[in-house]
Amino acid sequence: MMKTLLLLVGLLLTWDNGRVLGDQAVSDTELQEMSTEGSKYINKEIKNALKGVKQIKTLIEQTNEERKSLLSNLEEAKKKKEDALNDTKDSETKLKASQGVCNDTMMALWEECKPCLKQTCMKFYARVCRSGSGLVGHQLEEFLNQSSPFYFWMNGDRIDSLLENDRQQTHALDVMQDSFNRASSIMDELFQDRFFTREPQDTYHYSPFSLFQRRPFFNPKFRIARNIIPFPRFQPLNFHDMFQPFFDMIHQAQQAMDVNLHRIPYHFPIEFPEEDNRTVCKEIRHNSTGCLKMKDQCEKCQEILSVDCSSNNPAQVQLRQELSNSLQIAEKFTKLYDELLQSYQEKMFNTSSLLKQLNEQFSWVSQLANLTQSEDPFYLQVTTVGSQTSDSNVPVGFTKVVVKLFDSDPITVMIPEAVSRNNPKFMETVAEKALQEYRQKHREE
């Protein structure tokens, strides 16, 4: 008799495939009501995701407007910088024509300047740059022997540095523009779609995207070119067919931005001394010109800069002053261009980051491939509710809820008993935890 009673108790506790909460059975009707409440939360999150996508689209457009404004400023600064560089080169050419005037004086000073410059540079390199001192020393000696004191006198190193900087700046902007143009052509087509100009409706009841046929904005030669929204009015929503082309395009746009943006060879000047030292080390290894920046530490080198040849050629004073003025202007606009270029690059990275967010939003929604494939009307279906009394694996003080979300395998979530089954927040908490796990799983795939 006792065995029979125990058997009956066991059957009651496992009634209807384990759909029990302690000793109280959870009926099919209750499970259906819970599924309905949970699905409402999922529906709200889908709508939020779609709104989020549009918000990111708006941010991308705002960033693009800021980028255009910066590009206009860059073009203006570039024109002024190039004018100053041309003036500098003209002044340099005129000065070169009179370089023999003080040649003997300069050569004598140059012979005393070179040993000090080499020693100062090699000490710096050994202390800061460290690697390859022997090779650099040999290269530096050749460089100094081939250099002219007149080049030193008219700040040829500053001129060459400006010209090299100009070349690198132009290349950096070309790389960024190429990246943006590739991404922009994709985004232009993406954002022309009617989806981005309409408010998201209630996805739980009908497809908000099937009310109108989409115009063929995409180039028919594209692999993904097709009618993205071919669904007739009120046909159930299929997220995969709807969003996968969008998802593919966003991924392509992000790749187009990232591939080149992270390979820009130009390094923006940074105020910190250790960063400046790295730049000087690179210049010394490259062609020894970095050593000329140490001329202020050698007295005889400074004397070369102070040589006055005006007694032999009065016009040279004016030419040298013109060169000095144009150099200062060119350096000023080069620095301004650097600052604008760096801001421009930051805008590009911001756009890339926003595309990444857009990618993540679409990634989740576009994974809902079988959302309406089954006859089940619920996004979220509760299959089992249990507690520690009905399942020894459930921690004390928790309620175990097993759900199916979309086409997923069963997902188990634990809800603190402080949030009771009668609490309106119960199913919202269940749905939130289940959705977090669902999204995490798809991020890992």
From Swiss-Prot:
The keyword Endoplasmic reticulum applies. Proteolytically cleaved on its way through the secretory system, probably within the Golgi lumen. Proteolytic cleavage is not necessary for its chaperone activity. All non-secreted forms are not proteolytically cleaved. Chaperone activity of uncleaved forms is dependent on a non-reducing environment. This proteolytic maturation is disulfide bond formation dependent. Its main location: secreted. GO terms for biological process: chaperone-mediated protein folding; immune complex clearance; intrinsic apoptotic signaling pathway; negative regulation of amyloid fibril formation; negative regulation of intrinsic apoptotic signaling pathway in response to DNA damage; negative regulation of protein-containing complex assembly; positive regulation of apoptotic process; positive regulation of intrinsic apoptotic signaling pathway. It is found in: Secreted; Nucleus; Cytoplasm; Mitochondrion membrane. GO terms for molecular function: misfolded protein binding; protein-folding chaperone binding; ubiquitin protein ligase binding; unfolded protein binding. Coiled coil: none annotated. The modification Phosphoserine is found at residues 133, 392. Glycans are attached at residues 86, 103, 145, 277, 287, 350, 370. The keyword Metal-binding does not apply. Keywords: Chaperone, Cytoplasm, Cytoplasmic vesicle, Disulfide bond, Endoplasmic reticulum, Glycoprotein, Membrane, Microsome, Mitochondrion, Nucleus, Phosphoprotein, Secreted, Signal, Ubl conjugation. It is a peripheral membrane protein. PANTHER family: CLUSTERIN (PTHR10970:SF1). Functions as extracellular chaperone that prevents aggregation of non native proteins. Prevents stress-induced aggregation of blood plasma proteins. Inhibits formation of amyloid fibrils by APP, APOC2, B2M, CALCA, CSN3, SNCA and aggregation-prone LYZ variants (in vitro). Does not require ATP. Maintains partially unfolded proteins in a state appropriate for subsequent refolding by other chaperones, such as HSPA8/HSC70. Does not refold proteins by itself. Belongs to the clusterin family. This is Clusterin. It comes from Canis lupus familiaris (Dog). The lineage of its organism: Eukaryota, Metazoa, Chordata, Craniata, Vertebrata. The gene is CLU.
